[in-house]
Amino acid sequence: MQEIQKNTKKEQYNLNKLQKRLRRNVGEAIADFNMIEEGDRIMVCLSGGKDSYTMLEILRNLQQSAPINFSLVAVNLDQKQPGFPEHILPAYLEPLGVEYKIVEENTYGIVKEKIPEGKTTCSLCSRLRRGILYRTATELGATKIALGHHRDDILQTLFLNMFYGGKMKGMPPKLMSDDGKHIVIRPLAYCREKDIVRFAEAKAFPIIPCNLCGSQPNLQRQVIADMLRDWDKRYPGRIETMFSAMQNVVPSHLCDTNLFDFKGITHGSEVVDGGDLAFDREEIPLQPAGWQPEEDDTSLEALRLDVIEVK
């Protein structure tokens, strides 16, 4: 009995620590990008997955202590996919006292009609879903639309665009919607997926499967996701360093003429961002930038990232 109580206390301690970290990550993202302002009405897009449940829970938590007032309304889109459990979200939200709206639109039927059997339906489905959510935001008087993409999603998108699209483009933490009428925010932008997975399991969220439509997953994104997970396992801190790099862009040391006026450089021009360090041996920090070992990560040793010495 004592052993059970001891385990329960430890689990609660770990959950509190995890929630505190997620809350800190979300709070920092909100502050850094001015995501939420006084009087905002936030439409929280709730799919029934681990990410959107976590986003709603952390925003509700922050709402109680934030120095500004803002309201939340959870919105779920019932796309009439076969087997969709309509009762789950109302049963979860009503006891919490969360305002919510279930929007019923048969996008599943439209997608099945337009996309050949066996092909990935995600692109068309997401466009239809986006339009419906924008319309719903207007109907509800929402000033912001919150999506549940996290740090790993942002990095995956960056590498997808670099590997397959030939451009350095990630997923913005805050943007103007396609119709030019709504501000979209991603409060989980600084949150690690593995933290969200652990939090969702500990909170026992009633997860709704994401593949009810039967669509095949995006294989390219899966390749990137597997690659990043492998890097994170073999080189602790590499993911944090790459995300930190997205926040420390040096246009003068890339090759985009739209970001930096290379043609304007003449004799006598000032040195920009250190000039040319390509021929100097740079000091590589033992601990990757942006990474701090956690209290419960005692099994991880600080590893130097692979460095190729150019002779």
Swiss-Prot record:
Give the reaction(s) catalysed. cytidine(32) in tRNA + S-sulfanyl-L-cysteinyl-[cysteine desulfurase] + AH2 + ATP = 2-thiocytidine(32) in tRNA + L-cysteinyl-[cysteine desulfurase] + A + AMP + diphosphate + H(+)
EC number(s) per entry: 2.8.1.-
**Can you tell me which residues bind [4Fe-4S] cluster?**
122, 125, 213
Q: Which cofactor does it need?
A: Mg(2+); [4Fe-4S] cluster
For this UniProt record, the keywords arranged alphabetically read as follows: 4Fe-4S, ATP-binding, Cytoplasm, Iron, Iron-sulfur, Magnesium, Metal-binding, Nucleotide-binding, RNA-binding, Transferase, tRNA processing, tRNA-binding
UniProt pathway annotation: tRNA modification
* Superkingdom field: Bacteria
Q: Where in the cell is it found?
A: Cytoplasm
Which molecular-function annotation in GO is an example for this chain? sulfurtransferase activity
Q: Does the keyword Chaperone apply?
A: no
Query: Quick one: a GO cellular component term?
Result: cytoplasm
What does the entry's cofactor note say about binding and number? Binds 1 [4Fe-4S] cluster per subunit. The cluster is chelated by three Cys residues, the fourth Fe has a free coordination site that may bind a sulfur atom transferred from the persulfide of IscS.
Q: Which NCBIfam families match?
A: PRK10696.1
Q: What else is known?
A: The thiolation reaction likely consists of two steps: a first activation step by ATP to form an adenylated intermediate of the target base of tRNA, and a second nucleophilic substitution step of the sulfur (S) atom supplied by the hydrosulfide attached to the Fe-S cluster.
Q: How does it assemble?
A: Homodimer.
Function statement: Catalyzes the ATP-dependent 2-thiolation of cytidine in position 32 of tRNA, to form 2-thiocytidine (s(2)C32). The sulfur atoms are provided by the cysteine/cysteine desulfurase (IscS) system.
Q: What is this protein called?
A: tRNA-cytidine(32) 2-sulfurtransferase
**Which source organism does the UniProt entry give?**
Salmonella paratyphi C (strain RKS4594)
Starting at the broadest rank, the lineage of the source organism is: Bacteria, Pseudomonadati, Pseudomonadota, Gammaproteobacteria, Enterobacterales
